Amino acid sequence: MGKVHGSLARAGKVRGQTPKVAKQDKKKKPRGRAHKRLQHNRRFVTAVVGFGKKRGPNSSEK
């Protein structure tokens, strides 16, 4: 058997410590064809073809 990192008595320690934050109301996301359209626009249409390092979809850099 492999070793366990730490005892199971400490399981869930961090999640238990973090303060509860209420979920916020958000706009509904488009479904089906409309969502595919959104994805296509995000990935291919508005993407600027430039030189340098490729940035991921979650990048906040401009």
Curated annotation (Swiss-Prot):
InterPro entries (alphabetical): Ribosomal_eS30
A single GO BP term for this record reads: translation
Q: What GO MF annotations does this protein's record show? A: mRNA binding; structural constituent of ribosome
GO CC terms of this entry:
cytosolic small ribosomal subunit; mitochondrion; nucleolus; plasma membrane; plastid
Superkingdom per UniProt: Eukaryota
Keyword field contains Ribosomal protein: yes
| Annotated Pfam families | Ribosomal_S30
**Annotated region Disordered: where?**
1-38
Q: Where is the composition biased (Basic residues)?
A: 25-38
Q: Which UniProt keywords apply?
A: Ribonucleoprotein, Ribosomal protein
Give the family per the record.
Belongs to the eukaryotic ribosomal protein eS30 family.
PANTHER family per the record?
A: 40S RIBOSOMAL PROTEIN S30/UBIQUITIN-LIKE PROTEIN FUBI, SMALL RIBOSOMAL SUBUNIT PROTEIN ES30Z_ES30Y_ES30X
Q: What is this protein called?
A: Small ribosomal subunit protein eS30z/eS30y/eS30x
Q: Which organism is it from?
A: Arabidopsis thaliana (Mouse-ear cress)
Gene name for this UniProt entry: RPS30A
